[in-house]
Amino acid sequence: MARRWRRRSFLRLGAMAGAAACMGRLISGQTEALAQRMKTPHFPDDNPKWAKTWEAALAVLAGNVKRVPRYDQPVLLEGAVYPGIWLECGPLEGLVYSTLSGFVAPVEGQPTPQQVARANHMAFFALQREDGQLPASVKMTEAGYGQIQMVVPIAATAWELAQQTHDDELLRTAYSACSRWDAWLRRYRNTRGTGLVEGFCTYDTGMDNSMRWKGIPNRCPDADARKSPAIASMPRLCPDLSATVYGGRVALAAMARALGKKSEAAQWERDAETIRRLILDKLYSPEDAAFYDLDAQGQFVRVRSVVIARVLGEHVLKLEHAHDRAIFHDVWERQLHNPRAFWAPWPFPSVAMDDPQFVRPIPRNSWGGATQALTALRTPRWMPHYGKQAELDHLMRQWVEAISRYTEFRQQMDPLTGDFTRADASGYSPAALVYLDFVRRLAGASLA
């Protein structure tokens, strides 16, 4: 719509006399050529809402590309009520944005999606502390170090982006920074000596207002991610945090091989396999077909949450092994694809609907039951890998339909109705990316 408006405006200018007419024709031709170069996906039908929502999503992302005070390149902000980038999601959001480059019109003086994706990684590396700690967030007000807040490993997204863009500097920077980050986590988040990763506070996992963390502070004591609160049940061994480290080590092994560091690659592979086996041995409950936190008193924190999907997100289960195949079968049938648990009309709720801790009606910013855009954005990382493409297609159709109802981009929805929580402003980057990425995937468009 915007391109057509601009073209008509230029044609009206062309009606003027002389040199103005020539200039109008020139600009009009350039604009039309640009429109022809930009790809658009095949929408589900001829309803104009699809194209309207597509253009609105692109506009949201363009508007959320801004500079933060402590880094000199524009980044893609989380948007809405979140003026910054977070370690758990910012790098992945940048990576997904980069895959949409073919649909984003270049604007003179503005960074490309791939440049933005690079900045969404390099900002964290630039603000890494001397001891190896990466910031949990880089906001307009400050960089945050009061929790670790990780889900999709930054090593994995950096490796994917470096492969996509053939960026040797990014590869080398990421390998160094993520190696130091892994060392920091071993030093400060393995206080019980188990080899698994410990959670000290709610924000470590980014699961705000989840009953998983009932009674536990949001941040670490003194806003210091090295400190666990003086609570008898803390610290906890966390399957999702451990899976993040596993995925990071797999990526570090791949980066090391690409850099010709064969012995380091082999060590990363051994370390990855060690933590993978520990996750399955210590943090999986066959009785419930669920992954749980294990507290300092040896008790599972029995809240069936989307932690299960986060473990699968890093491909912790290896289907070539009979033991892992059995776990996946049970997790999928009893939990993730169970319409009483996680396979809601709009998947995946943050807590199983038949869990006593499921929270509904849905409050704002709730990982206690709401279906979150961040969870949806992560699903293509694991569902096709485990042979669930048809189910992913269904999930994607549900999401794009829900978003297109209002042409708004919000954090979370009710898993039973598909109605978004509208307490906060629209303009949430993950939801815009979900719409664009899912429409593209459903249309079978290429990644570039």
Describe each region flagged by the PLM.
Residues 1-9:
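N-terminal secretory signal peptides
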Residues 236-259, 269:
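Aromatic- and glycine-enriched pocket-lining scaffold segments that form the walls
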Residues 9-31:
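N-terminal export signals
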Residues 3-4, 24-48:
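C-terminal segment of N-terminal export signals and the immediately downstream linker at the start
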Residues 161-172, 252-267, 386:
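Inter-helical turn/loop segments and adjacent helix faces that build the functional surface
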Residues 83-214, 239-242, 246, 301, ...:
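Aromatic-rich carbohydrate-recognition surfaces in CAZymes
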Residues 54-57, 178, 265-283, 399:
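Short amphipathic alpha-helical coiled-coil/interface segments
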